[in-house]
Amino acid sequence: MSIVVKNVTKFYGQQKALDNISFEIKTGEIVAFLGPNGAGKSTMMKIITGFIPASSGQVFVNGEKIDADNFEIKQHIGYLPENNPLYLDMYVREYLSFVASFYKNRPCKSVDEIIDLTGLKKESHKKIGSLSKGYKQRVGLAQALIHNPDVLILDEATTGLDPNQIVEIRDLILETGKDKTVMLSTHIMQEVQAICDRILIIDKGVLVADEKKSEIYSKVQRKRQIVNVEFDAVPDEDALAMAVNADSITRTGEKTWRIESLEEEDVRSSIFTFAVANKLTVLSMQKEEANLEEVFRELTK
């Protein structure tokens, strides 16, 4: 199922939280929704899931308009909110059975099946309030998945988890997302790199990027080149810096250097020329490209 957002604006009183947002997520895509705190990510997700209305604009899921009264289309959406609201006095199995009872028109997974899928088997007899943060997140993900939704909206699904738990939840999202349309917000860029096809970036309520993961880096043009090079012997550092017109040169290992240059022309050819002139062999050389953190900072500063 696709998600189509058309010219969505949202006001809270006089404050504009979203400003004329439009995008489309196609069936089967896993899309990251990034932005600083307070940028409007959670607001947009609440509008997509029908929890709150937009002030203007429209949202369509599978061609059907999302509004407060369209309960049928909401049956196709699984949602894990940022604060993961749970009934802490209920037992895990009891809670998931309770959630499943609301989706009578959906081919729900069995409680046992969803417990196995989300790694809750050992904790299923416990009250939710006694679980660790990681297992509470798993319960939240289980309730979002139990009705086998076609669309999955995950707001900070890995917040507060340790590295092992993050990898486990990431793998779970990848596995369950194979036949679903997934939109997730996160501050963990490695997560985006690992599982997402496309990236949306929002800042101050405005959509500032909508790119495939492989193309997002073109949004940032570095003002300097950074090259890491390894020689077979130690060169004269001053001579190397002069030959490549380096703005900065840092020794990073026994025979390795990190060279920064403001030159417009590719400095790698100058490094090779220097090596030949000084009877050196270049063992390795790599030009650093902009990373996702740089793109994020550049577009949201």
Could you describe each region identified by the protein language model?
Residues 2-5, 10-203, 207-209:
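ABC transporter nucleotide-binding domains
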Residues 58, 226, 281-284:
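Residues at or immediately flanking beta-strands
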Residues 66, 104, 232-233, 264, ...:
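Short beta->alpha junction loops/turns
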Residues 78, 104, 119, 200, ...:
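A generic structural signal for secondary-structure junctions
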Residues 110, 236-240, 267-271:
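Hydrophobic side chains in well-ordered alpha-helices
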Residues 171-258, 262:
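ABC transporter nucleotide-binding domain
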Residues 263-301:
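C-terminal coupling/interaction segments
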